[in-house]
A protein has these predicted regions:
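Acidic glycine/proline-rich low-complexity segments
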Residues: 94-119, 198-200, 209-232
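Intrinsically disordered, low-complexity boundary segments flanking structured domains
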Residues: 64-66, 77, 130-134, 145-146, ...
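Acidic (Asp/Glu-rich), glycine- and aromatic
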Residues: 164-223
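Generic ordered-secondary-structure signal
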Residues: 34-35, 43-45, 74, 141-143, ...
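Trp/Gly-enriched beta-strand surface patches
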Residues: 1-22, 33, 214-252
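Acidic/proline-rich low-complexity IDRs
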Residues: 57, 89, 108-111, 131, ...
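Generic hydrophobic, helix-prone segments enriched in Leu/Val/Ile
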Residues: 14, 25, 87, 132, ...
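Catalytic and substrate-binding regions of extracellular carbohydrate-active enzymes
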Residues: 1-180, 185
Length: 252
């Protein structure tokens, strides 16, 4: 067993998990805005009680065969496995328990969607049920793996919640069976102004519909941050370009 101490010699508590031949150590670090913090890892003294933060807590809660709940101190998220593992509810506890999952019937939060022009139609991950596996569930981190399909192509999505962090991490991998065509149509007229790859609505996308009134959008551009005044960013030809290039992030 291990213990973690801060620079004052205080035992701050930790959690150790075994991963095969390796171990993973979790602890909550405090770092100043400008500077660094030093921590010491020692073997736990014999007979010493564990700090309260070292307990396994917040185990994932199975709602029913179609839904699964993942929860930490920041969020409570309900995944709908019958619809490709999309997010049915996303409650932000620090924002007055507001549910940020869009209550629309058109799209789902976290849905994969694109126009497969060889089939002549849109395909979506909600067409196929998904499988959910709990990868990690402790006081510091909740991590799940969702396995589903879009148009028979399998995908894996790993979603991570970290204690005290507003960010939700998504890691998506699609295992393409072949070189499938996704877009408005197969481009053949390269001298035309209109191009098949311009309109984002037909591209492979991850959808994040939100239930916001009078939203404002800020975009991270090189050396600047811009507030968008556009109703949308859809265009079909290169001479009608709208600003849809993001450097790192979008704030909504």
């Amino acid at each position: 067993d291990l213990s973690v101490y801060d620079w004052k010699g205080k035992d701050i508590g930790c959690l150790v998990e075994n991963e095969g031949k390796e171990i993973r150590l979790f602890f909550e670090a405090e770092i100043p805005p400008f500077g660094y913090s030093t921590y010491c890892i020692k073997k736990k003294e014999a007979g010493k009680k564990e700090a309260s933060e070292s307990r396994f807590v917040l185990e994932g809660n199975k709602v029913n065969k179609q839904e699964y709940v993942v929860e930490n101190d920041m969020y409570k998220i309900v995944f709908d496995l019958s619809k490709g593992g999309t997010i049915k509810s996303l409650i932000a506890k620090k924002e007055g328990n507001k549910d940020f999952a869009g209550k629309t019937e058109k799209y789902a939060l976290g849905e994969l969607r694109g126009f497969f022009y060889e089939e002549g139609k849109f395909r979506s991950s909600i067409e196929t049920p998904a499988k959910l596996t709990v990868v990690r569930d402790n006081v510091y981190e909740q991590k799940i793996k969702i396995e589903g399909e879009i148009a028979s192509h399998p995908f894996t999505q790993v979603i991570t919640l970290t204690k005290g962090t507003r960010r939700i991490d998504f890691d998506l991998t699609v295992d393409w069976k072949n070189n499938v065509g996704i877009g408005e149509y197969k481009e053949e007229r390269w001298r035309d102004n209109r191009r098949a790859y311009c309109d984002d609505r037909f591209k492979l996308s991850v959808l994040f519909p939100t239930d916001l009134h009078s939203p404002r959008v800020y975009k991270n551009a090189p050396f600047d941050v811009c507030e968008s005044k556009l109703t949308d960013t859809f265009f079909g030809s290169w001479d009608q370009i709208k600003h849809n290039i993001i450097l790192h992030w979008v704030e909504l």
